[in-house]
Amino acid sequence: MPSITKQIMSGAKWTSISTMCITIIQIVQFALLGNMMTLTEFGLVGMITTVTVFAQIVLDMGFGAALIQRDDATERQLSTLYWLNIMTGVLLFVLLYVSSPVIAGFYQREELVFLVRILAIMFLIAPIGQQYQYMLQKQLHFNTLSKIEIFSNVLSFGYLAIAVFMMDAILAYVISQVLLQSSKGILYWAVYRKKWHPAFVFDLRGMKDFFSFGAFQLSSRLVNRLGANIDMILIGRFIGAEALGIYNLAYQIVTIPVLKINPIVTRVAFPIFAKNKYENSVIREGFLNMTKMLALVSFPLLIGLVSVSDAFITAVFGEKWLAAVPILNVLAIVGILRVLMNPNGSVLLAKGRADLAFYWDSGVLLLYGLSLFAAVQTGSLLTVAWVYAIISVVNFLIGRWLLAYVIKLNLSAYFQSIMKPFLITAAMGIIAFGVSLSTEHFSMQAEMRLAISVAAGALCYLFLLVKAYPQTKSKLLRKGRLS
């Protein structure tokens, strides 16, 4: 196994443990909220999530990636970065508190004023540990990062599971998010403060290189997130909270693999790629292996989900959410493409090309914005979903060309790396869909239909996986003997 792939796999082991635990927690949380909330309340969750995403990007300011990418940061620069994070957090709290009526007015939902102000509290606490998080990541301490994230998510969910029965579900959710981000910040600070603590220094003149890289990274991430959330923003503004609730449910389901499974590899890959930034051949090799791993894990989840979408929605969220099924099926295309595009950022940042990422994201944002603005005027969520999927295909193709330019990635080799996982998964999806369709003729509960279909699909996938990758069988047998 190539050295860079070994490093990625080693870090991914700890990150995968964390991600699996967090994903299970969030799926249970998601199901709990789906059953406790109305469609409109779930739409408010989408609005609040959008505000949180943009505020967290601004809090980072692109300096996190700059810190990981650079090998020559001085103590003076590190201290300045730390205090800059603290000041940015305070500024964000004030801005969100003051602008909450504007946000509520945009979405035409008065209740957002109070909710956004509660949410803003996290930006007073989380920044104290943010830089420590990046330093842990840079030094590849993924075991420590994983333990902190698991504990914080368990704490947040434990609170939500109790509070949701004692107060408005939407308020309980917002407070749980404040608790989640704040506890992570405090714990990052607690575990690393003995190794490093900031001096009382604030020297902006020595931060030129950080500002240069960070400005492009911040702009790129803001533009990227705006492009990724423009559908939510426009649906909430022009179609309404109830429609956004339906769309948000479908969107959150298909993006769980993107947001939770991809970082198992990509979070580890960036610092490792950065250490090999002058070796294009090494990055290409690591990138192709990373892409194949992501495809083997994410494809069966997303395509399998489409195969059993009606039974899944009914069993987990209830019949009131069945309107989300056709939206989910279309957005699965977006989810698959996001899985494949997600590693691009690790490569561009490792190569120090935050500028290219910004220009790319800006062009795509314009395309997304104009197309989705036209789509929401129809008032049809399905139209919005299809437009989003088509533009995502265009974005995906642009991304492949960009990687060919930056690291001389051979497109034929790239598509070969994902073709086998796709064909295996497609066969699994057909089997699972056929079983799901067959069980409809029997008087079965949705839960039983779902269980039978998933079991059939999983067995089919494992069988085809061993046939397609014989080395997988030998590894499993070897581990079985060792245990």
From Swiss-Prot:
Q: What induces it?
A: By phosphate starvation, via the PhoP/PhoR two-component regulatory system.
This protein's membrane topology, according to the annotation, is: Multi-pass membrane protein
The membrane-spanning stretches of this chain are 15-34, 41-63, 83-105, 112-134, 154-176, 294-316, 321-343, 356-378, 382-404, 411-433, 448-470
Coiled-coil region: none
Q: Which InterPro entries match?
A: Poly_Biosynth_Transport (IPR050833), Polysacc_synth (IPR002797)
Gene Ontology terms describing biological process: cell wall organization; teichuronic acid biosynthetic process
Q: What is its main location?
A: membrane
Transmembrane helix is among the record's keywords: yes
What keyword terms does UniProt attach to this protein?
Cell membrane, Cell wall biogenesis/degradation, Membrane, Stress response, Transmembrane, Transmembrane helix
The subcellular location is: Cell membrane
| Pathway membership, UniProt | Cell wall biogenesis; teichuronic acid biosynthesis
One GO cellular component from the entry? plasma membrane
Other facts: The nature of the anionic polymer present in the cell wall of B.subtilis depends on phosphate availability. Under phosphate-replete growth conditions teichoic acids are present, whereas under phosphate-depleted conditions, at least part of the wall teichoic acid is replaced with teichuronic acid, a non-phosphate containing anionic polymer. The synthesis of teichuronic acid is accompanied by degradation of teichoic acid and reutilization of liberated phosphate for other cellular processes such as nucleic acid synthesis.
Q: What is this protein called?
A: Teichuronic acid biosynthesis protein TuaB
What is the native source organism of this protein?
Answer: Bacillus subtilis (strain 168)
Source organism lineage? Bacteria, Bacillati, Bacillota, Bacilli, Bacillales
User: What's the gene?
Assistant: tuaB
